[in-house]
């Protein structure tokens, strides 16, 4: 199986001298094709930094990032931008929906930018929204949607097309427990059915139990990893010393 995301001894520091902060320290991981990986850890542990570096949105101070086996270390900014647009979908806590576009237009825009016809892009967007229970909200603008609905639009946008990787930072943060489970189920199914690779940051052990593998991070260091075969309770025990903020 192909390593779709690979970090090799990645470190990230901010500032200099006494003010230097080490957000990541020699983090190494790999996520293979079709795998769903959850990342858990306390606030400020480096989870979001790990995700943005894995998605080539941020440069590591040292170390190397590979996407689908290809190092991005010496790529030009233009080539990285092209890689992101064609290969990686992002879902962050701030939804970044364009206020002047409808839900369907927000979802179809990345496809159109990549050369898909407007008509075909709309068909794909409507199908994606319908799959997330938003078929009747496709013509609504972001300010006409609830926070949970906007989050689902962002998830649909990240997954449309032939994206091989989806990176999600607390993708269910604005959703209730039922819709949160539905989102994780959808991501898990997409990984198994299409070979997509997903990396999801979450504080919720119940949601992390949908992943094939869970990585624990603390103080910028990957401290452990496990398969959640025994369910969320085993993750809570595993993470007790790593993340006191886990839902109990």
Which residue stretches match the model-derived regions?
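ABC family nucleotide-binding domain
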Residues: 2-217, 222
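Conserved beta-strand-loop-alpha-helix hinge in the C-terminal portion
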Residues: 221-248
């Amino acid at each position: 199986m192909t390593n779709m995301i690979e970090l090799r001894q990645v470190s990230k520091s901010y500032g200099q001298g006494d003010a230097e902060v080490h957000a990541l320290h020699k983090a190494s991981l790999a996520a293979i094709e079709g795998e769903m990986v959850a990342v858990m850890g306390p606030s400020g542990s480096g989870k979001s930094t790990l995700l943005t570096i894995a998605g080539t949105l941020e440069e590591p101070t040292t170390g190397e990032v590979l996407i689908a086996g290809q190092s991005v270390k010496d790529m030009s900014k233009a080539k990285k931008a092209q890689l992101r647009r064609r290969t990686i979908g992002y879902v962050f806590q701030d939804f970044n929906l364009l206020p002047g576009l409808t839900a369907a237009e927000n979802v179809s825009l990345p496809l159109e930018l990549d050369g898909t016809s407007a008509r075909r892009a709309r068909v794909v967007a409507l199908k994606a929204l319908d799959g997330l229970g938003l078929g009747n909200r496709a013509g609504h603008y972001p300010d006409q949607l609830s926070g949970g609905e906007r989050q689902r639009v962002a998830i649909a946008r990240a997954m449309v097309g032939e994206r091989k990787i989806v990176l999600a930072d607390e993708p269910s943060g604005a959703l209730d427990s039922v819709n949160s489970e539905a989102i994780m189920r959808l991501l898990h199914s997409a990984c198994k059915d299409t070979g997509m690779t997903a990396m999801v940051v979450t504080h919720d052990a119940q949601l992390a139990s949908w992943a094939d593998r869970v990585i624990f991070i603390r103080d910028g260091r990957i401290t452990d990893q496990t398969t959640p075969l025994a369910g969320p309770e085993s993750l809570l025990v595993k993470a007790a010393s790593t993340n006191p903020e886990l839902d109990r």
